[in-house]
Structure formats: C-alpha cells, structure tokens
Regions:
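Flexible hinge/capping segments at coil-to-helix
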Residues: 154-191
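Secondary-structure junction motif
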Residues: 190-211, 275-283, 289-301
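Beta-alpha-beta core module
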Residues: 152-158, 162-163, 225-274
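A short LG(V/I)-centered, amphipathic sequence patch enriched
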Residues: 40-59
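Alpha-helical linker/hinge and terminal dimerization helices associated
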Residues: 42-43, 64-86
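Short helix-boundary/capping micro-motifs
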Residues: 10-28
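N-terminal winged-helix
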Residues: 30, 34, 80, 86-116, ...
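Short beta-strand-centered segments that line the small-molecule binding cleft or hinge
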Residues: 107-111, 129-165, 169, 232-233, ...
C-alpha cells in the first residue's frame, strides 16, 4: 500500500468524480484509476461503486476513509519530526486566516520567508467555519482568527492580542473626531456591513442583540478590501475590528462603546497534535511583529 494510492482514494472520495480528482492531483485519469484498482486489489475489497453517471463509496470505502486520512497525517508528522530533529526548518507550513488578518500578517510573512527560505508557505483566507473544518481535517497547521463566539470540539485557542469591534470611517467623516462611538450614533449614518458569516459581522450582531437601534444598512460585502475602498471614497460607515485597518491610510477605527465589543485575536490549534517547529516559529514572529507588539503567551514556550 502506497501513500499516493491513499491520497488518490481520498481525493476521489472527496469529489466523487474521477475526472475532477485527476485534475486536482495533476495526474491522468487512467493513472488515477490504476492506483485505485491496485489499492482495491491489495486490500481485496471494493472501495468505490462506479457507474457511467456517478461514483460513491462502498461500506468498505466508508470504513477506509478516516483510516486513510489518519495514515497520511501520521506520515506528515513523521516527516516534520525528522526535519525538526535535524534542526533544519524545511517542508511546508499551511496557515489558515480570516480576511481581516491579511494586513496583520504581511510583516511576519516577509520576515519568515527571509529567515526560513526552505519552508514553503501556503496561506488560505477563508471564513471561520471553513478554516475550523480545514484545521480538524489537518489541511492547515494553524488558524489565525478572532476568538469565536462558540467552542469548537478538539480545538484550543490562544490569545495573541486584544482588540475591539469598531466603526470604520474615512478621515473626513463627522465621526472621525470621536474617540469612541455609540450604537445610536452609528444609526445616524448609512452603513456598509461585512457579509454574514464573517467574524466582524458575527461580533456586531452579538453586540446589537441586546439593543433595538435601527441601522441604515445600504450594502453588504464579503470582501474586506473592497469594503475599505468604499469607505475611503464615501461617507459610509462599516463595522470591522480595529486590527483590520493596520497600515491602511485614509481611514480611522473608532471603538464601539458597548458591552461585548471586545475581539481577541487568537491562534487556533488542534488539541494533543504534534506542532511543527515551523508553526511555532511563525507564531513567535507574529507575536513579536509591529502589527501586534503584545506579550508572548506562556504556552508558546512550554
């Protein structure tokens, strides 16, 4: 049994389509079919039910799938441990982050690549729910996101920095002179909100759940960078974390004066999992970056 056969089986099980799986794996469809057949012959079971229109997992396939995932994960851990034992950072580091972390990460990404040129970085910007799913499936080594409103089974969250939910306006907006802003003050202006599912939107809805102000929502967007461009060129108000506008010119973040408006920036890791040295190094550099400049949590050096 070879790891590539298990990788092929997992991809077919995920996509339930040989053509799509072969493209995703960058191999020919005939090679993919051959690898699946060899795996079935070696295990002496049928893993996939095929017909001209669809592919589905057999009972044996359903049983093998989690074992195949675990085998590939264990193989990856083995490789990472060997690299770490050689005291030479190498290999691949997969990082998941919510969109609001993009401006915070720039400095650390550049520093890390200079210090560790043999480590390839894969950065995935997605929603919190998508990232937590990737973390549980070992598709990313760590997730950078604000502290979620609910607990995720098997995931531990460590605070990197404290932050607040804020009204974001351009420098010439009437609210720009404020040090803080109330919900009733925000209600006087047209609002462009981040889309539902994004962390800032979730945090805002939690804050306003105890109030009954009416907001003039004119627009919803799932792309933070476009949202900020609109704010710079109009009198719209948006709601994001303060950290989102790190290194952004022409806009101001005004903390919202309301209970539960805190947003803690966190690194999320799987419990009881091997932690790559490269992952810990990345977290250390991030903690020491100008974008955060907060104390390193004790867990990092344990």
């Amino acid at each position: 049994m070879e790891l590539r056969q298990l990788k092929s089986f997992i991809k077919v099980a995920e996509l339930l389509n040989f053509s799509a799986a072969s493209k995703a794996l960058c191999i020919t469809q005939s090679t993919l079919s051959q690898q699946i057949q060899q795996l079935e012959q070696e295990l002496d079971v049928q893993l996939l039910q095929r017909n001209s229109h669809s592919v589905s997992l057999t009972e044996s396939g359903e049983e093998l799938l989690p074992l195949a995932h675990q085998t590939l994960y264990d193989a990856g851990v083995c490789k990472s441990r060997m690299n770490d034992l050689k005291a030479l950072l190498a290999g691949t580091l997969n990082i998941g982050a919510t969109h609001t972390f993009s401006s915070i990460l720039t400095e650390t990404l550049l520093d890390f690549m200079k210090l560790y040129p043999k480590v390839k970085l894969n950065i995935h910007y997605k929603s919190m729910e998508e990232l937590m799913d990737m973390l549980k499936k070992n598709k990313v080594d760590l997730v950078l996101a604000f502290k979620p409103s609910r607990r995720y089974e098997g995931v531990e969250s460590h605070i990197l920095f404290n932050n607040h939910l804020a009204a974001i306006v351009n420098n010439h907006h009437p609210l720009a002179k404020n040090e803080t802003v109330t919900l009733s003050e925000i209600g006087k202006y047209d609002i462009a909100l981040p889309a539902k599912g994004l962390q800032a939107r979730n945090a805002f809805e939690q804050v306003i759940s105890h109030y009954s102000p009416q907001f003039r929502v004119r627009l919803e967007l799932n792309e933070v960078h476009i949202l900020l461009k609109l704010i710079k060129q109009s009198d719209l108000v948006t709601i994001l974390s303060e950290a989102t506008i790190h290194d952004e010119h022409g806009v101001k973040a005004i903390p919202i004066d309301a209970p539960e408006s805190g947003m803690e920036g966190c690194v999320h890791l799987l419990k009881n999992n091997y932690r790559k040295r490269s992952a810990l190094e990345f977290i250390r550099l991030l903690s020491e970056s100008n974008a955060i400049r907060e104390r390193i949590r004790d867990w990092l050096t344990e």
